[in-house]
Amino acid sequence: EITKNKGRFLSVFFIVLLGAAFFSGIRSAEGDMKVSADRYYDEVNYMDLKVLGTLGLTDDDLADIAKTDGVKAVYGGKTVEVLHDIGESEQVVKLIALTDGVNEPRVVEGRMPEKEDEILVDTQFLKSSGCEIGDQVTFTSGTEDPLSDSLTGDTFTIVGSATLPYYMDLNRGTGSIGNGSINSFALLLPETFTSDLYTEIYVQADGAQEEASYSDAYDETVKAVQTKIEALEDAACDRRYTAVKTEGQEKIDDAKQQVADAEQ
């Protein structure tokens, strides 16, 4: 009967073959994507944890985390959110200090910054702003504080475009200025940032790189370190609050003294 209906048989055969191949591809795609992501994370030394502090993070915080059992390495990160005008609109850009050994960028075009007035921008920034490599960009503060409180300058020359491992899709996260959404990021040399405080601390857990990302073993390894770091929170917050309060009180006392001296 098959020989009498070769065309029909072959049609059914190839339909089944195509369906089986498609199903097998779908089933294996997730695993392949996870393996590729894990390899990429290892290549760029992606962080396992990120610590944030609303009042800023200090070298003491860095030292405490570094001494925590299960921590392989810690890195202090500096960032600042700024505004960039595009015609009649503006976009929020997160400026990030380049940090050796963690979250390494992949240069898509151009090169890495070599001077304080050079900048490596998000590929998305070039598309949205219409800027090109070699152009100069000027940023403004989105708060009452001048940009000079955070950076050595406000105008930079674009020397390249790049991607970052923790921005895997088009979403760049939420911000505290502008419309509340970050449109793109840009990378600067660490010495371009003037503050002694860190806005972020990146943590790599001991043994995490040997585990496959997204696996239960990886999650358990990182979770154990996270729990120990969270135990430092109360003491770190109290220490930072006291330091900020003391600094503020000293400024008030100095101002009062100046007023008293002027009245004499």
Segments and roles (model prediction):
Residues 1-24:
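N-terminal Sec/SRP start-transfer signal
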Residues 19-26, 30, 241:
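Alpha-helical transmembrane segments
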Residues 31-264:
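Basic-flanked hydrophobic alpha-helices used for secretion and membrane insertion
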